[in-house]
Curated annotation (Swiss-Prot):
Keywords: Cell membrane, Membrane, Transmembrane, Transmembrane helix. Pfam families: DUF576 (PF04507). Gene3D superfamilies: 2.50.20.40. The chain crosses the membrane at residues 7-27. InterPro entries: Csa, Csa_sf. The lineage of its organism: Bacteria, Bacillati, Bacillota, Bacilli, Bacillales. It is found in: Cell membrane. It is a single-pass membrane protein. The keyword Transmembrane helix applies. This is Uncharacterized protein SAS2374. It comes from Staphylococcus aureus (strain MSSA476).
Amino acid sequence: MMHSKKLTLGICLVLLIILIVGYVIMTKANGQNAQIKDTFNQTLKLYPTKNLDDFYDKEGFRDQEFKKGDKGTWIVNSGMNIQLKGGALKSREMVLYINRNTRTTKGYFIVGEITKDKKGYTHDKDKKGYTHDKDKKYPVKMEHNKIIPTKPIKDEKLKKEIENFKFFVQYGNFKDFKDYKNGDISYNPNVPSYSAKYQLSNDDYNIQQLRKRYDIPTKKAPELLLKGDGDLKGSSIGSKDLEFTFVQNKRENIYFTDSVEFTPSEDTSYESN
């Protein structure tokens, strides 16, 4: 009888320990997920910034990577990427380098065409396993919230496309991000990197805005993937990107990418060109 009581007590003790450990792990995971979501939310608060000139007066995260007196440079990038039925992956994107020191903005409109390497080699491949065949860059500047090509463009349609280009940060809105539910949130402390994925509906405001501006050849509602790397508390050498993926498979890919980053001015790729 005494042995039976000790056995029962031992089992209860083990179960109690398991419950406590499980609770601690769950609490830690929930806290980390909340921190990741809050980290993304700090960036998403920039959406919308309708007037790009406002970035001249916006302060971003600063650390020891910034030299004394450097006000920093904002890098904004938006692009639509479409590949249909095994054809080339075609992209149209723009990147601007908004220098707060000089209060000048330069960048490129990029028309890209990417095909798979038939032999499967890994040279010059991007993150989705494609090699870049044709990238045409058109230099631009931004003045008074207007995009201006800095070299003559004979194609009038292309010129208008560039001049009328709007970045996602100018019209996107994540005011309800804190209410997003059922996200797949992950964290890799070794890199470190972190991400959050959400299934959206076609009724989502941001999706309606994308469909209004782009001819998206699918009715499928996309997933929103938020990706970041660097210290969760903030890092000027880290990055945060968002991607709306409508279709992704071996033969067909349709996705929109966007990023807004704040970096030391001397580290911007445009300045080094």
